[in-house]
Amino acid sequence: MSDNIISFDHVTFTYPDSPRPALSDLSFAIERGSWTALIGHNGSGKSTVSKLINGLLAPDDLDKSSITVDGVKLGADTVWEVREKVGIVFQNPDNQFVGATVSDDVAFGLENRAVPRPEMLKIVAQAVADVGMADYADSEPSNLSGGQKQRVAIAGILAVKPQVIILDESTSMLDPEGKEQILDLVRKIKEDNNLTVISITHDLEEAAGADQVLVLDDGQLLDQGKPEEIFPKVEMLKRIGLDIPFVYRLKQLLKERGIVLPDEIDDDEKLVQSLWQLNSKM
């Protein structure tokens, strides 16, 4: 039996003055310790999901729907308990900075939790080191690069020891190298701390590395499954305006020419190796 850390049960949410729901009767579950990618076009409801998970928003009718995080049903009396379990890294880290230095910013969440100062200093030093920013502990966040700022934002979340990290378009403003560095960092942190990661993105290359993919379209769950189950559905993804990852585009083109590669070919390295093996047999 799977251990689900997050579950949505028939969740509908409508923004004030909006003529239609942003989410409509949405149900899904996320397994503890997994990496889930939530994909969809702009306006599909992805970021609304992240705000509901963290209690920043509430479903239209809690009597007809429920959101559960780490065994706690989200409600007015449990919202702060849930928020301690979930950390969000947003698209623009500048909007999250509150401290004069990197260390001050990382300490902010601990101060709100009244963590004793000696313990706080140890936690901050460890969190800053874990994201490779120890040399910048006394720097002003405004002087950092985009990738460095995201590292500091991740350190601030890591310091308060959440169960879930949500990357809400967190790499969309970074160059390809910076993006991959941040994703590699989060993968390591996830494994070292047994965290659950939710990546909200329209970048399917990023989503290809997830354990599970949820596809949203106009506030509804269009499909879900492993990347190798979702990405071959080229027409569905094109219809909702998403670009297919290169590996899956090439596999589709080869398939149309009678060359079928194994399902487990899901990244560039495996693709190159498979093509070399195929070439050696010709």
Curated annotation (Swiss-Prot):
Domain of life: Bacteria
Binding site for ATP: 40-47
Compartments (UniProt record): Cell membrane
Pfam families per UniProt: ABC_tran
Record has Metal-binding as a keyword: no
InterPro entries (alphabetical): AAA+_ATPase (IPR003593), ABC_transporter-like_ATP-bd (IPR003439), ABC_transporter-like_CS (IPR017871), ABC_transpr_CbiO/EcfA_su (IPR015856), ECF_ABC_transporter_ATP-bd (IPR050095), EcfA_1 (IPR030947), P-loop_NTPase (IPR027417)
GO molecular function, one term: ATP binding
Signal sequence interval, chain numbering: none
Record's bilayer topology term: Peripheral membrane protein
Keyword Transcription annotated: no
Domain ABC transporter intervals: 6-243
Record text on subunit structure and interactions: Forms a stable energy-coupling factor (ECF) transporter complex composed of 2 membrane-embedded substrate-binding proteins (S component), 2 ATP-binding proteins (A component) and 2 transmembrane proteins (T component).
PANTHER family linked to this entry: ENERGY-COUPLING FACTOR TRANSPORTER ATP-BINDING PROTEIN ECFA1, HEAVY METAL TRANSPORTER
Described purpose of this protein according to its UniProt entry: ATP-binding (A) component of a common energy-coupling factor (ECF) ABC-transporter complex. Unlike classic ABC transporters this ECF transporter provides the energy necessary to transport a number of different substrates.
Name this protein carries in UniProt: Energy-coupling factor transporter ATP-binding protein EcfA1
Species of provenance: Lactobacillus delbrueckii subsp. bulgaricus (strain ATCC 11842 / DSM 20081 / BCRC 10696 / JCM 1002 / NBRC 13953 / NCIMB 11778 / NCTC 12712 / WDCM 00102 / Lb 14)
